[in-house]
Amino acid sequence: LRNVYKFASALILSAAVVVVALVYVNSSAAAAQGGPTIAKDSVQMRAFTFSSYKGSYDTFSWAPLINFRVNGPIPSGGQLYVEYTVPGAPAVKFDCSTEETPADRWWKTECGGRDGIPEEKGTTYTGPFSFAIKMRNELAGSDTTLFTGKAKIAKVHSNEIKTGKFANHFVYYVDHDWNLPIGYVYYTQDDLKGWDRPILNVAFWVRGEAVNLDPHLFYKGAEVGRIMYQGEQVGKASCESDVENNTTNFVDEKDAPQKAKWSRVVCSFNNVRGWDRSGEEPGMFGALYQLDKNPGEYELKVLWNNKLARSVKFNVPAGGKLDTSLAASNKLGTERLIVPVTIIGDQDGTWDKAAWKTDAFYGNPLTGFTAAP
């Protein structure tokens, strides 16, 4: 991963929690193409549940809540917006916070929900619906579609009683089972040495709470990246969620497995580096593990609640540079190695193992990808 992210501005608004960030990007597909592009792996569609429907508080409804990243350039006068359609209803449009962005940066925004869509536009529809991310420019007289997709809406009853006036209090959510078989391997910069000593990261999805995760990396059958000092492990690898797609209202787990929540987990290995070109001698804890000096197949095994739950295998070529060609050919918008993820055990509950074939990236499935058996 050669992108260098540095936050330059952030804006947080209430209710829809509109988060906007302008960051640097060293290499961008948009720069090569001369126009803005959407990073497909950044698009996250959720359902915002309204506590009314057509003026009645006896029935809940929903509207889309989306966040995504745009690789620049975004020209002066450019305005991002989303248009969505549910069967039997006219299209609805809502604007997203937008800022002029040069080609070497990207812009991230979250929009929709209560702040972007009037409550009277709420719907009780469930099933697939279409949406598009667009950019209009009143100054240039242009209107361009940047991304089109489909998301599947489902519902589950709220954690209230299920009778009387509460009978139609359903909470809506987007099904993200398609994410589970798809993982990513990439590097991030070292805080001090930058790309001279990049850190290994592996990302994957779980259905449920991304807590109590313990990652272990293996090479030729032996665990690597563990450094002990005076009987204590230092620089221990860790996992945490960086994306959580969940409901906006409380639901009971007995009604919705894992409470209809999907979390993207990033496991970072501080002791494992793509290479070390810093020229520094090893410190007091010893040398860091270098992938470029140990090419071949690696396997990440992850314990979740003390049970083996994930296996991710990937190859590192000589020199340590990851093969991001699959991401490039599918115009993912982010330079990452895409890898299959093996789901082990039953902690994710029952999930659709074939969803990735048609639903991945909201109806834009990967070409050239095969899920793990």
Predicted feature locations:
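Bacterial N-terminal signal peptides that target proteins for export
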Residues: 2-12
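Intrinsic disorder/low-complexity segments in short proteins, especially the signal peptide
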Residues: 6, 16-18, 27
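Bacterial N-terminal signal peptides
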Residues: 11-21
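Signal peptide processing junction and immediate N-terminal pro/mature segment
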Residues: 22-32
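Contiguous segments within soluble domain cores/interaction surfaces
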Residues: 32-145, 172-302, 310-312, 318, ...
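Extracellular interdomain linker/stem segments of modular secreted and single-pass surface proteins
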Residues: 152-159, 317-323
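Disulfide-bonded cysteine-rich modules in secreted/extracellular proteins
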Residues: 156-171
